Amino acid sequence: MLSKLVVLALSATSALAVSPLGGGTWRSTNPSFNVQTCEGGHVSGSEFSIPAKPSGSSSGGACSNGHTRAERRYTNDYSSGKHQFGGELRINSFGGDRVSVKQTFNGDDGPFFILGVKKNGDLYSVEGGGKTIASGVARVGATVTVNTVHDASAKKYQVYVNGELKFTQSAPGGSFYDKIGTYTTDSGAGPIDVTWSNVGFWTQ
């Protein structure tokens, strides 16, 4: 009986772990990161929160535009090949609307892809004209698995939600890196508190 319980526990753990998607052989990487906050944003481990309004504090090293921010900036910089991010996003509380939870930056040109969440739980592409990626999956209390696959050589970017391909767009050339956390979009506002868990990075 004990052995069966152990097997079940291990199976449950495996089911919860985020895995790379999209086919092919992926090699796991472990990039470091820098914590970036601005205007009252707070990072505690893997939990990210921003207030309803800017606090007036420009400390945190990431306040060039004055938006509220609580993010990790990963040092996974790349300019060619295939690169994948995966993680589980939980919305702990949300009293605002239209907040970024994941960004892929095109070097000094800024983000070319921003994954945003609306108060109704929709995930959407902020930079892609506000196109809905997945409806209602990221409501308060929900956990959603997100994978992004960027083929920098082919200039293609894809987003998987809960294991299903939901969004594909063309990508520019250049150098890239990823951020996760919370960041107020131009049309959005906090407060919001989220947790990113089981985060992984892979390359081909």
PLM feature segments, named:
Residues 113-114, 137-149, 172:
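Flexible, surface-exposed loop/gating regions in the mature catalytic domains
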Residues 19-24, 77-89, 96-107, 170-204:
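Ligand-recognition surfaces built from glycine- and aromatic
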Residues 21-24, 122-145:
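Short, aromatic/His-centered strand-loop micro-motif at the edge of beta-sheets
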Residues 1-17:
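Fungal secretory targeting signals
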Residues 42-121:
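Secretory/extracellular carbohydrate-interaction modules
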Residues 87, 141-151, 157-159:
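Short tryptophan-centered beta-strand motifs in secreted/extracellular beta-sheet-rich domains
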Residues 28-50:
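Extracellular glycan-recognition surfaces and repeat-rich motifs
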Residues 160-164:
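Short strand-turn-strand beta-turns centered on an Asx-Gly dipeptide
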